[in-house]
Amino acid sequence: MIQQESFLTVADNSGAKRIQCIRVLGTNRRYAHVGDVIVAAVKDAMPNMGVKKSDVVKAVVVRTKATLRRETGNSIRFDDNAAVIINDDKNPKGTRVFGPVARELRERSFTKIVSLAPEVI
């Protein structure tokens, strides 16, 4: 579960390395899970890239340490909390996605992120 002040690693090549959650988008929502959109501040970035430190960006959560229960009864969890930076059209800013992503992103219409990911769990 991601909440305000949570740090996430960035799983794409947009230039950011770490982001900090400012707000979970939605009507008065407290926690973000896989597939939710958050507003975040870039805390660590690579030089000469698309995003800079202290930029405010939108991102979609692709991995969480919290256990994710599926309707089939399976449960999965990842080793880190990670997000992919997106633009206003829900397309990723980067051209590559690193690491596995959850299958729930396809159901939430983030098909571009799913197609760029090396593995969908």
From Swiss-Prot:
Protein name (database record): Large ribosomal subunit protein uL14
Keyword Ribosomal protein: yes
Function: Binds to 23S rRNA. Forms part of two intersubunit bridges in the 70S ribosome.
Species name: Synechococcus sp. (strain CC9902)
Subunit-structure text: Part of the 50S ribosomal subunit. Forms a cluster with proteins L3 and L19. In the 70S ribosome, L14 and L19 interact and together make contacts with the 16S rRNA in bridges B5 and B8.
Gene Ontology biological process terms from the UniProt entry: translation
Stored InterPro entries: Ribosomal_uL14, Ribosomal_uL14_bac-type, Ribosomal_uL14_sf
Recorded GO MF terms: large ribosomal subunit rRNA binding; structural constituent of ribosome
